[in-house]
């Protein structure tokens, strides 16, 4: 005789419920993070089409990245011949903009530019053999390092760095976001070169620095 007893064993319903709830929460968190990413990209896109100087836009972008990643520092370097020049930062004194330089052969930032690849180091980035010390930048002692190339027309024109003072395990989402932001900055620079007031012979660094300091009218 075949039994049709479908009664659930004691505790099995609770176990099933306990398994479903974490999955639902995980899915909800992923959806929220995706919405935050889309919001970030939208904010950057809107900033790119406003009547703002390049320095203002870049400063706005680094501030948005800092807010999204909860990092302590975000820096944008742009290529000037064989050097990378600091053109935007959420922390550096204004005098550091355009002054801090490193060769493409130097540092973790130079490696990212040369290799055209993302680089993530969760702790003790300053111990990496490729690391370059500046001496006058607080980021010299920061633990975690995340960096992505700035791409314009399939060419590296800069690098964007995210730094954490404490060790930080970078998520796949953070890596994707920084990669996309690097591409958005590249698009911004391409569009800037099309502006009627842009000097044809000027490179990206000259375009940014000649646009006036952030906050200028």
Write out the residue ranges for each language-model feature.
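Signal-transmission linkers at sensory-effector interfaces
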Residues: 2-50, 55, 157, 188-215
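Amphipathic alpha-helical coiled-coil segments that mediate homodimerization
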Residues: 40-48, 53-72, 76, 108, ...
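GAF sensory/regulatory domain recognition
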Residues: 63, 73-100, 104, 124-127
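Short beta-strand-to-loop transition segments that serve as allosteric relay/switch motifs
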Residues: 92-93, 159-168
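Signal-transducing coupling segments at domain and membrane junctions
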Residues: 94-95, 122-144, 164
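Acidic/proline- and glycine-rich, intrinsically disordered low-complexity segments
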Residues: 95-119
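A short, aliphatic-rich beta-strand micro-motif
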Residues: 143-151
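Allosteric cytosolic regulatory segments
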Residues: 179-186
């Amino acid at each position: 005789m075949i039994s049709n007893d479908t009664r659930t064993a004691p505790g099995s319903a609770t176990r099933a419920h306990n398994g479903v709830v974490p999955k639902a929460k995980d899915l909800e968190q992923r959806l929220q993070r995706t919405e935050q990413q889309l919001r970030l990209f939208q904010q950057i896109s809107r900033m790119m089409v406003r009547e703002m100087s390049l320095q203002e836009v870049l400063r706005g972008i680094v501030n948005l990245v800092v807010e999204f990643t909860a990092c302590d520092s975000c820096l944008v370097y742009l290529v000037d011949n064989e050097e990378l020049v600091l053109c935007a930062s959420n922390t550096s004194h204004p005098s550091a903009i355009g002054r801090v330089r490193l060769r493409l052969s130097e540092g973790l930032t130079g490696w990212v530019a040369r290799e055209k690849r993302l680089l993530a180091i969760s702790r003790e980035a300053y111990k990496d053999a490729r690391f370059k010390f500046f001496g006058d930048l607080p980021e010299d002692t920061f633990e975690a390092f995340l960096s992505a190339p700035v791409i314009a027309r399939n060419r590296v024109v800069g690098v964007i760095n995210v730094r954490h003072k404490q060790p930080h395990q970078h998520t796949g989402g953070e890596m994707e976001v920084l990669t996309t932001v690097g591409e958005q900055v590249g698009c911004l620079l391409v569009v800037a070169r099309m502006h009627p007031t842009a000097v044809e012979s000027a490179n990206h660094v000259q375009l940014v620095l000649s646009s006036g300091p952030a906050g200028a009218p």
